[in-house]
Amino acid sequence: VRSYLAGHANQQAHTTHETSPRAARHPGRRARRGAGAAARAALVGCLAAFVVLPAYAKYDVDIDAPRSIRKLLKTHLDIARFAKRDDISDDQFDFLVTATPQQVRDLTATAGYFSPVVRTDVRTRDGKRDVRVAVDPGPQTVVSTVDLTFKGPVGTEDPKQEAATRFAFSLKPGDPFTQSDWDVAKGAALRQLQARRYLGAKIASSEARIDSRTQRATLAVTFDSGPTFTIGKVDVDGVRRYPEKIVTNVNPLSEGEIYDVQRITELQRQLQNTPYYASVAIDVGDDTSKPERTPVHVKVSEFPYNNIRGGVGYATDTGPHVQGSYTYLDTFGAAWPFTVSGRLDQIQQYGQVQLSMPPGAKGWTNSVLASYTNTNVSDTRIYSARVGVQRTRTGQFIDYAYSLMFYQDRLDQNGAGPTTSRALVPQWAWTRRNVDDPLFPRSGNLIHAEAGFAIKGVLTDQTFIRGYARGQQYVPIGKRDLFVFRAELGGVFTSGSSTGVPASLLFRAGGSNSVRGYGYQSIGNSVAGSVLPTKYLMTGTAEYQHWFNRDWGAATFFDIGTATDAWGERVFYPGVGIGARWRSPVGPINVDVAYGLRNHSVRPYLTLGIAF
């Protein structure tokens, strides 16, 4: 048995970076690889010198260390990385073993352990070598103080930005110190400072002073904000097929406004929301000697004139589906998009044609459209034809839509013959997004509202006013938990029954995005086995989510709702359940199992959980 022992007696070897017996300096971004790099260089030379020697049998390595550093050592220790090679000579093997204690010290230091005890044992049995590396990392260094200082005008011009930068620095007193966390904290704080006004901000100096005796880290970072940047002229590259005026019309930036990365992101989003551009890249000049009216460079890659898209999918409510669309982007030679689209699933068949104008001033888009939908659910069939015009605008936080639509619907049911209704409806729709992350929100809210009316005799069978609203609130609980609340209200206000109102403008409840535990659109006015749409709707959800890691979580929820023609005769349908949550690359995917407390049934649900 050959043993190699390195402990506190050899602390001077693993603290060669120390400036005094008690303290070691680790300037920002300085790699802690001095001894490790030298060892690796020697190893390469040693391997090159002995490549002509006879091959030796492979050896096995067992690393006995706490979980917090075991993976780090298995991944980066040379003796572990070369274990499967069969061309390691005896001298090379001895060098690997000898270098292991210093490599362990270098690696554990990056994880905040500066006084490890390392023991390396080699045993040979039946011609096979077994290497055991035992590591006691000792106490992990923790952050004792954090000193962030700022140079430049940020302190007087924008104290809120300085405060936001301090908040973005993620290492706090009492937190474990690691090299990766130290780098992440500096990077996050710098990006926050650069996000508004101070595009040219930089880290003037940074230092992590480590006291290996007390296992305390004193952190200091000095930021230089540099001057305030303002937005200049937007120039566009890559325009070949479509007018450059499209970029001008959707551009939300004004020359001279203070630089804000969210405004730059909004410009990119506005361009990508148009049908013309496959990709958009934006670069803003960051020359601190010319901060005023800094140029904004936009590079676009255009879609061809003809586009065909298609896809297949599955949803619990509607079953498997297939969908597709064809778009010609240069109708009349004037960049007017003409689109034909359709979707088929088990309960609904849908088709639409739409002709739009290019975005006009301030990004408003005008279009004319016609659609036809055939829906067969809950023993009720609705045939709905629509034609109309609309004017829409999509903003960073708020979307607007104004439309004038003509509806003609036919309703087939079990208890009576078909009924036909029509209406000419001026409508308004408004959506506001105020969340921290548009794809995976943890805080904030989403609100959508609609309003419309129709007057009898004006291509309308029955006078009515229609309103609908839906809201979703996200409330974070600690770092891993989350409450989600959802509410939905709808009403068609008219005298008498709703037989003259187009059925597609009425309401039913039930399903994955409504009241779980009940079938899709199975809550409504039940007549002879048919569930008819109703005048009033109310649903609500309270959901609690716990996330085990960044991507996976679990949920428990309570849903309740009703759909009725007479509010005084309403019946509420509650449901409870549990589910799994996955933050997939395409968006949040929810898998739920719900129990309907009124119908005593269990139903599974699979949904792509994007709100709206």
Task: Identify the residue ranges that each predicted region occupies.
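N-terminal signal peptide c-region/cleavage motif recognized by signal peptidases
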Residues: 52-54
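Periplasmic polypeptide-binding modules associated with outer-membrane biogenesis and secretion
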Residues: 57-70, 81-316, 325, 339-357, ...
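N-terminal secretory signal peptides that target proteins for export/translocation
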Residues: 1-35
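Gram-negative/organellar outer-membrane beta-barrel architecture
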Residues: 155-166, 260-448, 513-517, 523-526, ...
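Bacterial N-terminal signal peptides
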Residues: 40-50
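C-terminal outer-membrane beta-barrel translocator/porin domains of Gram-negative envelope proteins
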Residues: 273, 307, 412, 416-419, ...
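C-terminal structured "cap/appendage" subdomains that terminate the fold
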Residues: 561, 567-587, 598
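Flexible, surface-exposed loop regions and adjacent strand-edge segments
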Residues: 150, 238, 358, 383-388, ...
